[in-house]
Amino acid sequence: MTILKWALIFLLVSIVAGVLGFTGISAASADIARFLFYVFVVIFLVLLILGLTIFRA
């Protein structure tokens, strides 16, 4: 859950920076948020597949 929380924090930083006119910082933090979200999704899917197949009791 920590990766998702950091992705949301970077998303909020991106929105605030965009509203204040810092477009470079906004784009960079949006890219970081997108990357962290994709990492979260990949980890979630891997653990879901492992839970449904290998670790079935």
From Swiss-Prot:
Transmembrane segments: 6-26, 35-55
Subcellular localization: Cell membrane
Keywords: Cell membrane, Membrane, Transmembrane, Transmembrane helix
Membrane topology note: Multi-pass membrane protein
Record bears the keyword Signal: no
Main localization of the protein described in the UniProt heading: membrane
One cellular component term from this protein's GO annotations in UniProt: plasma membrane
Keyword Cytoplasm: no
InterPro entries for this protein: DUF1328
Family: Belongs to the UPF0391 family.
Annotated protein name in UniProt: UPF0391 membrane protein bsl5717
Organism: Bradyrhizobium diazoefficiens (strain JCM 10833 / BCRC 13528 / IAM 13628 / NBRC 14792 / USDA 110)
